[in-house]
């Protein structure tokens, strides 16, 4: 069943830290946009909050990532760090399970940053819209390099109209 997409959606950051463009992420899979459009955060704490009211679609057994389906129609993947699947859940606590309803601002996952760093891994938190093809425009509302607090709005999405839906996904426009 297809999620109904709201016409315009703003995506807040689920974590505090320094805003990065997805293209700056040190992983082709994410930086190329093939998983979806979005943004990344160099975290300043270890709390991942729900960016909007949603249903938890998936919690990875290793707790380093969570998938949400928002009431706004956005399907979101929040991925903590690069290569962190190797940690097998060490340093990560999940507060939610698959199918659970969550409210905006509710804590989803907590992670201990030193565990990631000690393992020599990148702690960048990646936020991607996996149903990016439903949207025509992705506009960053803040510049990369800015410090953001959890729940600050950072990305604006515009839903496609019917004709555009046939064409494919748009690209992220940088903030000017």
Residue ranges with predicted function:
Residues 1-176:
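Contiguous, well-folded functional domains in the mature portion of proteins
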């Amino acid at each position: 069943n297809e999620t109904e997409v709201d016409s315009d959606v703003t995506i807040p950051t689920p974590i505090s830290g320094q805003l990065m463009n997805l293209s700056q992420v040190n992983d082709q899979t994410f930086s190329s946009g093939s998983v979806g459009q979005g943004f990344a955060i160099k975290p300043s704490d270890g709390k991942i909050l729900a960016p909007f009211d949603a249903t938890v679609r998936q919690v990875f057994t290793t707790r380093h990532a969570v998938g949400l389906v928002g009431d706004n129609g956005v399907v979101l993947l929040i991925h903590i760090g690069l290569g962190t699947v190797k940690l097998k859940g060490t340093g990560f606590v999940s507060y939610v399970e698959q199918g659970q309803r969550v409210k905006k601002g509710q804590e989803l996952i907590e992670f201990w940053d030193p565990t990631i760093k000690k393992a020599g891994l990148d702690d960048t938190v990646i936020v991607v819209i996996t149903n990016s093809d439903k949207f025509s425009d992705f506009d960053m509302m803040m510049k990369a390099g800015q410090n953001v607090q959890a729940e600050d709005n950072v990305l604006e999405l515009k839903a496609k109209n019917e004709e555009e839906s046939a064409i494919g996904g748009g690209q992220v426009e940088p903030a000017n």
